[in-house]
Curated annotation (Swiss-Prot):
Protein name, entry field: UPF0441 protein YgiB
HAMAP family noted in UniProt: UPF0441
Location of region: Disordered: 178-223
Annotated Polar residues bias: 204-223
Compositionally biased intervals (Low complexity): 178-195
Originating gene: ygiB
Family: Belongs to the UPF0441 family.
Top-rank lineage group of the source organism: Bacteria
Amino acid sequence: MKRTKSIRHASFRKNWSARHLTPVALAVATVFMLASCEKSDETVSLYQNADDCSAANPGKSAECTTAYNNALKEAERTAPKYATREDCVAEFGEGQCQQAPAQAGMAPENQAQAQQSSGSFWMPLMAGYMMGRLMGGGAGFAQQPLFSSKNPASPAYGKYTDATGKNYGAAQPGRTMTVPKTAMAPKPATTTTVTRGGFGESIAKQSTMQRSATGTSSRSMGG
C-alpha cells in the first residue's frame, strides 16, 4: 500500500508539473517566434523619383521606372484625402497638394461630398518612395509611396512618412535603411476624407508608439 501511495504521489507531481510548465514553455516559444519575426527586416532604398533610382542602380532603369509608377498608383489609392485644397495645404504646405484622381480609393458617398464642396478632393504629392525586394523572395521589387510636409507646424515636416503616418526619418532621398517587412506591405485604401490636422495626429500617435516600443525593447534587453 505504501508503494502504491508513493507511485500515485509521483504521478501527481508529474502531472502537476506538466500542467503548470506547459503554458510557460508555450510562452517561451512564443517569445522566440516573435523575436524571429521582428528580425525579419528588409533593406530598402529611398528615392525621390525614377531618375534617382536609375542613377543609383545602373542597368535597372526599367525596374526603377516600374517601381516609381507603381508607387504613384499606390499613393493615389492610399494617400490621405482632403475635402478642400486648404485643408491639404494646411497639413503639407503650399505647392505640395494635388487634386486626387476620381475613384482613387474613395467611397462613392464621400467622393460625392467632396465634389459638392470643392469640385474634387485633394491629396499630398508623393515626395518619394521606398524600394525593396518583393516579399517572399521574388525576383521583382516592392515599393511604398512616401509623403512629406513643408509646413513647419506639421509633425510630417521634413520627414518621410507612409500612408499610415509611420515616420521613416529625414526626407532625404538616396538613403538606405532597414525596415520591418510589414512596412512594404500594401496599405488600406483611403475611403474617407481626413479633417485638417488629422494626418498629423496619426503621425504623432505612430511616433509615440514607436518610442514606446523602443523603450520596452531596451528595458527587456537590459533585464
